Amino acid sequence: MTKSNGEDPRAGSRMERFQQGVRQRTLLAKKKVQNITKDDVKGFLKRNGFVLFTVIAVVVGSILGFSVRSYHMTFRELKYFSFPGELLMRMLQMLVLPLIVSSLVTGMAALDSKASGKMGLRAVVYYMTTTVIAVFIGIVIVIIVHPGKGTKEHMHREGKIEPVTAADAFLDLIRNMFPPNMVEACFKQFKTSYEKKIFKVTMPANETAVMTSVLNNVSEAMETLTKMREEMIPVPGAVNGVNALGLVVFSMCFGLVIGNMKEQGKALKDFFDSLNEAIMRLVAVIMWYAPIGILFLIAGKIAEMEDMGVVGGQLGMYTVTVIIGLLIHAVIVLPLLYFAVTRKNPWVFIGGILQALITALGTSSSSATLPITFKCLEENNKVDKRVTRFVLPVGATINMDGTALYEALAAIFIAQVNNYDLNFGQILTISITATAASIGAAGIPQAGLVTMVIVLTSVGLPTDDITLIIAVDWFLDRLRTTTNVLGDSLGAGIVEHLSRHELQSGDAEMGNSVIEENEMKKPYQLVSQENELEKPIDSETKM
């Protein structure tokens, strides 16, 4: 039935219900505001104090950094000025090694092989999906905006790039997964270096025939039948830094073996559980110092910038393009993916990891941020420890959405600067190489610049042109690190949601095993009690 004027009465009732709902929510909000007490304010500040202090530290650090630029401090003065920030980095990096090992061992030991296999597969699928999406966003944005207009002659260059071969870089990645010495893996990574070697090469047959006809002396002919050739050959080398990939692989295998050992491996499992708990308590202490360290890290980096004008012009457009790409991925794609899988509010989840994101912005290292990320996810967002201990260390090592997006975008920007038209095949090569190279980028500051060489080499672009973008990389590195940490954290939430049935069944099995263990102890206790009753009062042994 409809009204005489043709209006649908249901539409009017829906509008009335909507208006009534809005009025009720408004009244409820007013009541909540009116009922706020001093205790509520204190409780809010207590719960979110760390986050507020960290946000204030970022703002104050930015203001302080721009304020002291006018003093033109020397390199030594800048080092002294940034010293509190350096202390924070050292404290966080101190905890990374034991945290990666203990968390992965305990996480893998707490799961059976079937559950850990399913969880690992879900994590890898998530990592690959988000990385491919990030690369796609970076390529589309840089093609649409086209920040590489103009010529590179007027652009500022900075730094020096070491040559590297793509094949050697990928082989190094695999070599680092299996370190020959676990102690050395704690402070060194394998890296192929190059040295010049001179070879004697035999001349081709047609050239030798001419030479022998010209030369009558046989000995002279034999000497001239060879010529010298120089070649850069790969030799084994090493660089300072934790081999995170090797430790991750070893810890996962070690934890899986301990879990399968059941009762025999309980002592080792308890040891790593205690170690993990001790590290997290140290993190709680360091978190009080984090705002001060972040303040001076940001202030020192801003004061260190040589020329603010470099950020303008062509590099300014490049910077804006990277920021737009990272924002689309971090603010739209990742939250949408989290909501689509879990049907939960992603912004509530992101609010719980806000301090980890700000720490990533300040430290520019996803590995250094790992202790804070653990604490935020487990305490604020109540993510299962078995998930965080498994997903976060692996994610901090191989899941680099921000880095993948940046590398694909920067490679095409360098092609545009050189007026180099890329065809579809070359763009596809860039996307595949950027995805693979981001896996090899360790969670250390400015690792993206190193792997960028691999991406440029894959399509024949000049690697020296990386020096064009180094001037703004310190800032963009912080943004892509924040994106990486956000991707790892949301990934932990998604994997936990998808693995909830395995986790619940694991809890049930653990409960049953405890009951069985108690039941097995009871007969023994009864027998021992009976034996004690049968013993004589005089317990001395008779000769």
UniProtKB/Swiss-Prot annotation:
It holds the Pfam family SDF. One of its GO terms (cellular component) is plasma membrane. It catalyses: K(+)(in) + L-glutamate(out) + 3 Na(+)(out) + H(+)(out) = K(+)(out) + L-glutamate(in) + 3 Na(+)(in) + H(+)(in); K(+)(in) + L-aspartate(out) + 3 Na(+)(out) + H(+)(out) = K(+)(out) + L-aspartate(in) + 3 Na(+)(in) + H(+)(in); D-aspartate(out) + K(+)(in) + 3 Na(+)(out) + H(+)(out) = D-aspartate(in) + K(+)(out) + 3 Na(+)(in) + H(+)(in). Keywords: Amino-acid transport, Cell membrane, Glycoprotein, Membrane, Metal-binding, Potassium, Sodium, Symport, Transmembrane, Transmembrane helix, Transport. Homotrimer. Contains eight transmembrane regions plus two helical hairpins that dip into the membrane. These helical hairpin structures play an important role in the transport process. The first enters the membrane from the cytoplasmic side, the second one from the extracellular side. During the transport cycle, the regions involved in amino acid transport, and especially the helical hairpins, move vertically by about 15-18 Angstroms, alternating between exposure to the aqueous phase and reinsertion in the lipid bilayer. In contrast, regions involved in trimerization do not move. This is Excitatory amino acid transporter 1. It comes from Ambystoma tigrinum.
